Amino acid sequence: MNSTPKQIILIRHGEKPGDPALDSEADGITLSTKGFERAGALAPFLWASFGDPDFLFATQASKHSCRPIQTITPLATALGRNINCDYADEAYAALAARIFGDVQYAGKLVLICWHHGKIPELTNALGGAPPSLKWPPAAFDRVWQLPYPDTAGARTGALPVRNLPRMLLYGDSAA
C-alpha cells in the first residue's frame, strides 16, 4: 500500500533570542518574545492556507534548543494533537523513512518544524527539490510545501517544493 502523504509542510522554528535587553528569554534555548508571537499566529495561518495538519513533528529537544517544539505547541493544543519529537536534528532521514514507511500517513497533511540548517537535507530526504541549498539564517517567515501526487509513480525525479511567505507578523516578507 502507498503510504505517501497528501502534502508535507516544512517550517523553521520561531525567532530565537538575540539581545538580552530586547528579549524576554535570553537563554538561547527557548523562543524569543517575537518567536512566541509567531507560534501563536501559526494555527490560523495553517488552517486558512492548508487545513488542519493530521500529524505534527518537531526536532527533539536538546541542551541547545527546544524552539521547534515551542513553535508548534499552540497549534498542537488547538488541534488536540500530540507532537512527535522523537527525532534529533540530524535524524531527518529516519523521519522521512518513518513517514513513507507507515500507512497511517497516507493521504494526510504532515507538518514538520525543524532547525533551518537541516531543512534542505530534510527536504531532499522527503523526495523534494529544495528551493535553495540553504535556508536563509534570518528567515523565520517561510513555508516549504511539498504537495505529493495522488497516485504512486506519478512523479519522476525530485518533487518541486513551493517556497511560500507566511506573513504572520509585521515585517514578514510578502513574496
What are these regions (language model features)?
Residues V110:
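Mobile, glycine-rich extracellular loop/lid and propeptide segments
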Residues N2-G107, K118-A175:
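Active-site-proximal alpha-helix that buttresses catalytic centers in soluble enzyme cores
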Residues C113-H115:
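Short beta-strand segments
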